């Protein structure tokens, strides 16, 4: 009995396998990028009077509560609307540095912000933030609204991240209660 040899062209095989490979790649990429480093804000209120002092915390967590090699962040602000008076309660574990810089590169793609707090933490053993637990506070900003405060937005952008994680920042809208 003769063997059956179907005639399938190479092009037909590729056309058949391409959607399967694409679907598999999309499914698997979801597993690879499923872990995230998340940086957000925590504050009691977002409504402020002109010339009012306030405090806002910058908070870190991972989606899987896992440890990482660290993170670098930027907290962008509009210096015509608020002044950052001091940066307090920094997470000491793995702290690399904290400084205020002019936002000439417009990292947050927001033309209204002109400065940012640049901060970073690192652990070469991939054990950051250590025994702090999650979520954990990275730092607190002590700030004051301008005398003519009309509202502004704070933005967090990610400068560097653990290679095993995707990362996301956040925005916080601060509104003026002048005239209320």
Regions found by a protein language model. Give the residues of each.
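Acidic, low-complexity intrinsically disordered segments
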Residues: 33-180
């Amino acid at each position: 009995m003769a063997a059956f040899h179907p005639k399938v062209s190479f092009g037909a095989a590729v056309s058949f396998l391409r959607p399967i490979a694409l679907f598999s790649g999309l499914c698997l990429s979801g597993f690879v990028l499923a872990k995230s480093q998340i940086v957000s804000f925590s504050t009691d209120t977002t409504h402020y009077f002109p010339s009012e002092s306030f405090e806002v915390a910058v908070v870190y967590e991972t989606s899987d509560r896992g440890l990482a090699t660290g993170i670098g962040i930027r907290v962008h602000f509009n210096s015509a609307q608020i002044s950052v008076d001091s940066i307090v309660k920094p997470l000491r574990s793995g702290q690399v540095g904290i400084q205020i810089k002019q936002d000439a590169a417009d990292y947050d793609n927001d033309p209204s912000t002109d400065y940012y707090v640049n901060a970073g933490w690192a652990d070469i053993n991939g054990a950051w933030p250590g025994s702090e637990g999650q979520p954990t506070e990275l730092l607190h900003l002590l700030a004051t609204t301008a005398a003519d405060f009309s509202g502004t937005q704070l933005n967090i952008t990610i400068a560097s991240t653990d290679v095993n994680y995707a990362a996301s920042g956040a925005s916080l809208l601060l509104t003026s209660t002048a005239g209320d």
